[in-house]
Amino acid sequence: MKYGASSLAFVSLTAKAQRASPPLGWAESAVPAVSDRDTPPIAAATDAASHLTVAVRIDGKGPYHFVVDTGADRTILATEVADELGLFRGEKVMLEGVVRAVLTETVAIRTMSFGSITCRHRVVPTLSRTLLQADGYLGLDFLDGHRVTFDFKNHTLQVSEPRPRLSASWARENEARISASGSGGHLQALDCVVDGVAATAFIDSGAEVSAANAPLLAALARRNPSFGEMGTIRLIDITGGEIVGKVAMVNKIRFSGLTFNDCPLVIADFLVFGVWGLRQRPALLIGMNLLRQFARVSIDYGLKELRFDLAAYLPPPKPLITMAD
């Protein structure tokens, strides 16, 4: 059995797992999120790779510090935490990282609580805390169906109910709203254009860097013969696998209401593009190096929309982010 995984950083990449079957007789369930007014923002710590981490309780124990990863299909738990809690060991599964796949154990969790939300009867893969650099990763199995707001200005993170559909077309001043499509949490923005090349984009909050796939690189080279790589970089995923990626600079990444200028991208045959069904066409992974330029980023999995708040953005002499014309 194989489970997909992936995420990016300059010195390491982190893996994500797809669904593992629960023990016989278990049924997965979740306590619905309460309304926004009853869901206060949760103070978020920052790990070595500048990801936001939050406190999670497992079977009533903790708190444990988890990276919130919108590119991960499934939640992953550190082996050391599983040992500490004496969790039941399940079947072994093949966990497919960014670079390679490894055989890893699964454990059964009765309750996992984050803020006002509690998930019950989960089976999750495990990896060493040394590789994760955290106690675990919260994936789309936990986040899908909710609205996740990364408030970089106030250093908080909030998981709440989706916006009401009547408010879907409304946006605050200095807020860019982008519609997305997809299912199972795989929200993709289809109106992305990278230096004149149409591409599909998705947000991965577990990725320290932004990345492009080989089809996007090829399309950029065809459009601009002078386009080329600035160099190479070695990346390591959490399974211990290594890959050498190409580093390239693009002039503009444009969405319907937003433009990024002068963006460095890492380009390689990362497995995450295959997991998201984007291996054969130009695709872009938006990582933390771009997200952190905003005051706030919101991903609404119910309404299938992305919102970027520029209210507190202070541009350098040459802006990295501008509102599109």
Predicted ranges, named:
Residues 4-325:
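Pepsin/retropepsin-fold aspartyl endopeptidases
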